[in-house]
Regions:
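Glycan-recognition and catalytic cores of secretory/periplasmic carbohydrate-active enzymes
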Residues: 1-201
Length: 201
């Protein structure tokens, strides 16, 4: 619906979107507590910001802040000392898969957190989430987390940490294999959102 509104600027599209938010607000605590939403909040936070900027409806800001308070701290991940070696050297694929099944999406679980914080596309989504949180709380650290994280990841794992290694995980700096398109697309989107468009080309 938002894509239609951006393309056509029709009030009817915005009305449909506002009706959805009106419905969602009634179960917002459950939505904000969902493990997937907590791990990947960027799309929803960005949508709330855009709708708020257009409509000025205070409820949009309230929903965004409630959601932001429950999400994974991606700015902390992106600005902390990064994993400097390929993740495959820290844990085998079999062990990681078994751990993920056992934890069943628990963000506090060791393997779940390891998988998220060493996944190139997830880190790109996290960069956008940090930027959105920075817009909400005015934190310069969160606003700059995408650039800081990119510089650290690039230093230890090469361009776009998987974008040039055909591996969705942090895999070191070897650029000898093909391109992982999902990762390239995710980071290009993050660069544009973070005002780092020059990195996207």
């Amino acid at each position: 619906v938002w894509a239609l509104y951006e393309a056509e600027a029709k009030k009817e599209d915005l009305t449909v979107l506002l009706r959805w938010f009106q419905w969602a607000a009634k179960q917002w605590d459950d939505i904000a507590a969902d493990e997937y939403v907590r791990a990947f909040p960027a799309d929803l936070l960005e949508l709330l910001e855009k709708v708020y900027r257009i409509t000025g409806i205070p409820a949009m800001l309230k929903l965004a802040r409630t959601l932001s308070a429950s999400t994974m701290n991606w700015s902390g991940v992106l600005t902390a000392t990064p994993i400097q070696t390929p993740v495959s050297k820290a844990v085998s694929a079999e062990e990681l898969d078994a751990g993920l099944k056992k934890e069943n999406g628990d963000l506090e679980g060791y393997y779940t957190r390891l998988a998220l914080t060493t996944n190139a596309a997830a880190l790109a989504d996290g960069a956008r989430a940090a930027l959105a949180r920075g817009w909400l709380n005015g934190s310069a650290t969160e606003m700059n987390a995408a650039k800081t994280g990119w510089e650290k990841i690039s230093r230890y794992h090469g361009a776009i940490c998987g974008g040039l290694t055909a591996n969705p995980m942090l895999a070191g700096g070897n650029p000898s294999t093909g391109i992982f398109n999902d990762t390239l697309g995710a980071w290009a989107e993050a660069f544009v959102c973070a005002g780092m468009g020059a990195h996207a080309v």
